[in-house]
């Protein structure tokens, strides 16, 4: 007898759903933290979703370091961006394999690379503008799509999972990002801030999207019905992750909720699958308060497990 989640004839979604349904609601909720515990009965080790690969595998030992993103963009060379992505994910996979042999599942050892940064660099005062490909939505789209394709590869499994960030309209000033409300016209959204994300989803099949800290037209990015609706419209079928501790900002700095369970519920119901931070520790409290359903938790868990299955983490080879 083979468990359904082990059946490679099934789609990644079907396998993820089958695995999720072997878990209790409490266990499903635990998988939504960025530092997810092991699922021992399935042979799935613990996993830390947080890894960086903007211009090289970051913070995890020796790796090739390419020029910063803004400098790579200055070459106007999309084929080069593909090759850069290929090198980064090959090294990330090698580091992951090496760490896994020793049971090391710490931060910066995983296959979910939170890159590229495809925000539009409009204001030179933004201290992280060098992480972007500049001010041009078209150039950002072309370079970003090729970087994602290089990262993810074209094999049966993803070599690594790229992540389009920060969705959306995130471009400083850095000191205001936790309470800032970006007021943007529909025209500017469609012409400036969304094209690169749309291209990475539709053309690049990017596996991850990260929500930003700021609000957009009053809605927090990690719980924005408008932004999540765009992802559904484009056919996104990966995982959505919050920027780190962004959901906590809902009740601490944006002041749009009163409590951590309310913030967790707002993000989860909108479609945020994985929480970088600790607010999703309050998911079960939100369930007890009637703010979310068990199905909300199950849906997010399936999305998270689907990505890990696409990375080959459930299969011996």
Kindly label every feature range from the protein language model.
Residues 1-317:
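Glycoside hydrolase catalytic-domain context in secreted enzymes
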């Amino acid at each position: 007898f083979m468990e359904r989640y082990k059946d490679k004839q099934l789609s990644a979604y079907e396998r993820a759903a089958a695995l999720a349904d072997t878990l209790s609601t409490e266990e499903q909720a635990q998988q939504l933290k960025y530092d997810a515990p092991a699922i021992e009965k399935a042979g799935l080790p613990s996993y830390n979703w947080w890894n960086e690969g903007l211009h090289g595998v970051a913070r995890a030992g020796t790796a090739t370091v390419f020029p910063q993103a803004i400098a790579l963009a200055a070459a106007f060379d999309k084929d080069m961006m593909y090759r850069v992505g290929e090198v980064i994910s090959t090294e990330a996979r090698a580091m992951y394999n090496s760490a896994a042999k020793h049971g090391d599942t710490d931060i910066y050892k995983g296959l979910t690379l939170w890159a590229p940064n495809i925000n539009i660099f409009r204001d030179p005062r933004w201290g992280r503008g060098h992480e972007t490909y500049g001010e041009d939505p078209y150039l950002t789209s072309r370079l970003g799509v090729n970087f994602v394709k290089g990262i993810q590869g074209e094999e049966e499994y993803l070599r690594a999972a790229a992540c389009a960030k920060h969705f959306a309209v995130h471009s400083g000033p850095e000191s205001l990002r936790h309470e800032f409300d970006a007021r943007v016209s529909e025209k500017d959204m469609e012409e400036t801030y969304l094209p690169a994300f749309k291209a990475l989803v539709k053309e690049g099949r990017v596996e991850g999207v990260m929500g930003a800290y700021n609000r957009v037209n009053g809605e927090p990015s990690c719980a924005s019905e408008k932004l999540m609706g765009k992802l559904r419209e484009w056919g996104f079928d990966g995982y959505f992750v919050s920027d780190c501790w962004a959901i906590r900002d809902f009740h601490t700095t944006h002041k749009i909720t009163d409590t951590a369970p309310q913030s967790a519920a707002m993000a989860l119901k909108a479609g945020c699958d994985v929480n970088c931070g600790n607010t999703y520790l309050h998911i079960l409290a939100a369930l007890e308060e009637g703010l979310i359903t068990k199905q909300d938790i199950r849906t997010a868990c399936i999305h998270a497990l689907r990505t890990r299955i696409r990375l080959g983490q459930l299969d011996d080879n």
